[in-house]
């Protein structure tokens, strides 16, 4: 089984060093996506322009994509909403992740980058099954994580890992 990496960070220079592709997340939406070098050189949104200006981008870090295109992770219209009102009387939904779609192929590294509070951690928790979703789908190794049984999900989880930014701070 080939590997792929999903890097979730607010540090654009680190994403540039490790990733082939990038998706810029803001208020739960992917607002810009593509080849990392193209996105960095020609940012289309204000958020991306600010991220590029805020950090030093390391040259010579572009990764070569492996020719074999096995899809390992497919996320389609994923939604993670939190009810922050007094349910059921006054529902107000915070759309932490809203209609997020991307694919990750064998040999690729995709960076999810955005400012604090934009939905990166919520997306990570949803992808690992630690947070329920409000809609959309997550396919990992061709299996829909929201519809498979507990035993199959447990077997798939051996291939999923979170590496925290500062492991000692998580204890």
Regions found by a protein language model. Name each.
Residues 40-69:
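C-terminal boundary and immediately downstream tail of ABC-type ATPase nucleotide-binding domains
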Residues 128:
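Helix-to-loop junction immediately C-terminal to a conserved catalytic motif
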Residues 33-34, 42:
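ABC ATPase "signature
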Residues 113-114:
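The feature captures the beta-strand-to-loop junction immediately N-terminal to the Walker
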Residues 15-17:
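A short, surface-exposed alpha-helical micro-motif characterized by mixed small hydrophobic
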Residues 136-144, 156:
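Conserved ABC transporter NBD signature motif
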């Amino acid at each position: 089984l080939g590997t792929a990496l999903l890097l979730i960070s607010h540090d654009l220079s680190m994403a540039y060093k490790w990733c082939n592709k990038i998706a810029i997340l803001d208020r739960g939406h992917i607002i810009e996506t593509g080849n990392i070098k193209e996105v960095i050189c020609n940012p289309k949104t204000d958020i991306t322009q600010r991220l590029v200006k805020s950090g030093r981008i390391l040259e010579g870090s572009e990764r070569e994509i492996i020719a074999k295109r096995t899809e390992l992770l497919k996320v389609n219209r994923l939604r993670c909403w939190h009810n922050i009102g007094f349910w059921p009387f006054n529902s107000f939904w915070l759309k932490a992740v809203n209609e997020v779609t991307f694919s990750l192929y064998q040999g690729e590294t995709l960076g999810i980058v955005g400012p604090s509070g934009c939905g990166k951690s919520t997306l990570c928790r949803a992808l690992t099954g630690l947070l329920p979703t409000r809609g959309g789908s997550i396919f990992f190794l061709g299996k829909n994580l929201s519809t498979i049984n507990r035993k199959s999900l447990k077997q798939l989880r051996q291939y999923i890992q979170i590496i925290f930014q500062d492991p000692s701070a998580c204890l």
